[in-house]
Every structure is written in C-alpha cells, then in structure tokens.
Amino acid sequence: MSTIVIDYQTESIPDDWLYPAEWRIQRWLDCALTVLAIDEALEVTIRLVDNDEITELNAEYRGKNAPTNVLSFPCDWDLPEEPRLLGDIVIAVQIVNQEAKAQKKKMEQHWAHMTIHGLLHLLDYDHIEEKEAQIMEDLERTILAQLGFPDPYCA
C-alpha cells in the first residue's frame, strides 16, 4: 500500500480564507495513488498562496504574467531515502474558489480536482498534446469518481 506524506503550507493565507483541511488533501492523494497503483512511500508539499504569489511563480517558471489555479514543481533530485520527494504543488486559493463559484461546483469538488491535477503533473502526466490531455483527464475522472465527485469536465 502506498503512503504519502504531506507538508501542508498554509501560513501565508489569512485565517478567514476558505481552503480544505489537511485530512481532506490526504484522502484525495491517497485515493489517487491507489487508483494509479503506486506502491511506494512518497512526499509532496502542498503550498497555498494568494494571487500575487501565483502570478510571480507563473511568470518566472512559465513565462506567463497572469495568475493560474495550480502549478506543479517536480523534484528532479534522485534521492535514495524514503519517502521519495515528488515535489511541490502550489495552489492559488482565491483562483480555485472563484473558479468553483463561476463553474457552479462545490468547493470541495473543485479543490479535489485541482489537487489531483497537480499530483498527476508531479507524476509526469501532462495535457499539452491532445492524446496526453485525454489520458490525464480520464485519470482525473476516475480518481474523482472513486471519491464520489462528478465528472469535472461536464457542465
């Protein structure tokens, strides 16, 4: 059975902002690893940020001077110890909450989707090419269905 250790960084987020409890993040990632049949000890950092910080990161690492919902930074160090460090998932709290409201989705559903989306990027899935996007979206649908959430791509 896989295990995932989470370093959940929420220090820079005001107390009155809405975001999921760490146990929910843990549940979503555990489910994803089970569906993906990954059987190793892993570690991931989940960092929650505001629009300014996500915009800076998006500009620096993707050349896009605009906010985005989630960024993933895979760890490229080949470290021998366990758990294996996968990398960082950076989530923009305001963006994710605004998207959920605009798309008329439950907050928990959209947060689960964005968290799983970020994890899949750390595991080397991508959506640049249409074929890759279909594979990634199908995995997201499967994992979210296991968690009891509807298809995130249906209106």
Swiss-Prot record:
GO CC entries: cytoplasm
Pfam families in UniProt: YbeY
A GO BP entry: rRNA processing
Cofactor binding annotation: Binds 1 zinc ion.
EC code(s) of this entry: 3.1.-.-
Highest taxon of source: Bacteria
Binding site for Zn(2+): H117, H121, H127
Cofactor(s) essential for the protein: Zn(2+)
InterPro entries: MetalPrtase_cat_dom_sf_prd, YbeY
Keywords: Cytoplasm, Endonuclease, Hydrolase, Metal-binding, Nuclease, Ribosome biogenesis, rRNA processing, Zinc
GO molecular-function terms, A-Z: metalloendopeptidase activity; RNA endonuclease activity; zinc ion binding
Entry's localization field: Cytoplasm
PANTHER family associated with the record: ENDORIBONUCLEASE YBEY, CHLOROPLASTIC (PTHR46986:SF1)
Family the UniProt entry places it in: Belongs to the endoribonuclease YbeY family.
Function: Single strand-specific metallo-endoribonuclease involved in late-stage 70S ribosome quality control and in maturation of the 3' terminus of the 16S rRNA.
Name of the protein this chain belongs to: Endoribonuclease YbeY
